[in-house]
Amino acid sequence: MVVPPWYELPPPGYGGLEQVCSALVDGLAAKGHEVTLFGAGTGTGTAAHFVGTDPELQHHRLGQTLPELAHLTRVNRMISPESFDIVHDHTTVGPYATDRPVPTIATVHGKPTGELREVLADVDPKVGLVAISHTQRRLAPELPWVATVHNGISTGNLVTKSAPGMGPVLWLARFSADKGPDLAIEACRAAGLPLVLAGKCDERSERRYLEQVVEPMLGPDVTVLRNPDRDATVRLLLAARCLIMPIRWEEPFGMVMVEAMATGTPVVALNRGAVPELIRSGETGLICDDPSELGPALREVSRLDPGVCAAHVRREFSAERMAEDYERVYRAFVEPGLEPPVRPASAPTVAW
């Protein structure tokens, strides 16, 4: 398995892709697969055999092309058909790894529009693209998709609340207009409820948005927490009345919604992106078509059963389910035309 050189697995705080990859690595290892994880840094937090292409995480170069290309070049030097049966790539440049001597699938984690859509449209058919939601796939149906696999989360050690949370409404994301923290403030004030804005605020654009847009709106009813770690995030979710997801973009997935429901916390969200694929409105949350509906929904959502929310995640978005789905993709891609067995007698070796 190949991950970008700037991500730590599992993540110490915010990080949807990192959570997914960690859960998948551990899920595959639990099923008996030998998994090698190619990344940067020390990589000691998963069940995979870790191979680092750089001794230091490249988080200070996040989004730059050259470090990811260098990472991919080093990975390709270490991949051979004698060592691996399939490569699963999560990098942006992974879909262009056409010279690998081992079959490669690449999960697309971003929104496949604009320049990314143009790039992916030119991918060699020897590389299979996997979508993380039907919504994402519909945004670019002409791309060479081979499967759609919903992201999953490790649920084994998660604590689930037994009764609805009585704390503030929680917004948990990176500080940007797309994530709608300003809409969260307006909705909570309309409902007369306190709000916690807990989010990633590392990059210059995130800090600028917080300072210029969010901070002028703050009052005693809104608390801001920058970059909470994993333990703090879980505590916030367990205490929260609900998670609010007032997104303004066609988000391909939204891992935070799954994480919230896993703790028994329902989600109030705008009907954008993959929201209707993840939430069962009226059971695990409430989906609103317009921002004006968010306030009333925040008042109503406390009637939902935390146990139903958690059971929904265990059934539909567990790491085990994700690993099983990817097993089918691997086998179908390695042996086209063959129906992959549900429980293979011998497990292939997977390079992440």
Protein language model features and the residues they cover:
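Catalytic cores of nucleotide-sugar-dependent glycosyltransferases that transfer UDP/GDP/TDP-activated
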Residues: 1-352
